[in-house]
Amino acid sequence: IKHLGKLHTLDLTNCDQITDDGIKYLGKLHTLNLTHCDQITDKAIKHLSNLHTLDLSCCDQITDEGIKHLCNLHTLNLYDCKNITDEGIKHLSKLHTLNLTCCKKITDEGIKHLSKLHTLTLFWCDKITDEGIKHLGNVK
């Protein structure tokens, strides 16, 4: 992978043999999909801070510690990332698009930090209440 210098977009969905060591070569991509890449950890995420779009759906080892490096992305998909909490998403306030579907630990407190988003997906986020939605009314 490290020899693909002109590559723009890479989809590695379900490539469960990809590890943190392989990810360090992908920081210059525009778009990267790592859905169900089960061996990817927070250690790899720091190499992806310059991407435009990143999909980490169902990457169970990703935590708040990893996503704090992703504050400059345009689009981030964290679908079913079970270890993401309010603490992690507060670092994502500059994003344009964020998917938090099935992120069961996200509460009203977390989404109030997301005022610059244009698109936010919160399907099956059971801890979001009217209070959290009220903050979204102030989205700029």
Each model region followed by its residue ranges:
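The feature encodes a structural signal of leucine-rich repeats
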Residues: 1-2, 20-24, 42-46, 64-68, ...
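Concave beta-strand-loop units of leucine-rich repeat
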Residues: 7-18, 29-40, 51-62, 72-84, ...
